Curated annotation (Swiss-Prot):
Protein known as: Small ribosomal subunit protein uS2
InterPro entries, sorted: Ribosomal_uS2, Ribosomal_uS2_C, Ribosomal_uS2_CS, Ribosomal_uS2_euk, Ribosomal_uS2_euk/arc, Ribosomal_uS2_flav_dom_sf
Domain of life: Eukaryota
Primary location recorded for the protein, binned into one broad class: cytoplasm
Complex formation: Component of the small ribosomal subunit. Mature ribosomes consist of a small (40S) and a large (60S) subunit. The 40S subunit contains about 33 different proteins and 1 molecule of RNA (18S). The 60S subunit contains about 49 different proteins and 3 molecules of RNA (25S, 5.8S and 5S). Interacts with rps21.
Pfam families (UniProt xref): 40S_SA_C, Ribosomal_S2
GO molecular function annotation: structural constituent of ribosome
SUPFAM superfamilies hit by this protein: Ribosomal protein S2
Family: Belongs to the universal ribosomal protein uS2 family.
Compartments where found: Cytoplasm
Region (Disordered): 267-296
Amino acid sequence: MAPSQLPAIFNPTSQDIEQLLAAQCHLGAKNLQVHMEPYLWKTRPDGINVINIGKTWEKIVLAARIIAAIDNPADICVISARPYGQRAVLKFAAHTGAVAIAGRFTPGNFTNYITRSFKEPRLIIVTDPRTDAQAIKEASYVNIPVIALCDTDSPTEFVDVAIPTNNKGRHSIGLVWWMLAREVLRLRGSIASREAEWDTMVDLYFYRDPEAEENKEAIEEAKAPGADEVGAAAVDQGFAGAGDWEVSGATAGAFTAASNTAAAGGASWDAAEPSDWAAAPAAAGQEWAASGTEQW
């Protein structure tokens, strides 16, 4: 990391540098835009361009000072058409008071005053100059300054402040937006001192896949009781109703005895029926025979 050109109070801590490296903010693309060459540290043997983390931090502080200089936070517009940055811009807007455009940028937002979504911001911040090219183009028409998260292959035309970082990873995008929001709040005085920790976790700025969250909830609901525990005791505890089944088995024996009694009752009916019915037809036969002979 090159020596910092900032005042000592703005120097990053070792934890800040570790977070930038852990989120892979220093890993750029294989292509290199000529205007991004000053932010390049070196090129790896596999062709990946490595970004100078010191330059990244300097540009984060510079962008935060520009944002804090605007009196009305609602005059700042943060934009992200890239899905990995949509959650980050919404959180940034919630914490700093800016206006967020997450998702598709409607053409004419800055130039067509007839539309309902017409805006006149004093500053815009975009996640990727390539995916947010329409917003940058319209900002150039109406002289709006642009701050952008730029990778080594990002076009820098009409970009006033480029923050060199990896703008394709979910963690790198979320971390840079989180650091930018924290620095803005520090300059505004919302955070008491630079030594004080911000109570907002960086995880809130990371992208989350809705389908993955739904699948995770479905898996947790489908788990059997005791499946998370280890050992035979957990399984026995999970199927604690086995004793109830044994009791019901005893009850089933009572039902078996009752069915045997019913079967015995059926046998007595069978025994009674042949004697009664066999005797009755015989008697009837004798009466008919007797009456017939008497008449004849």
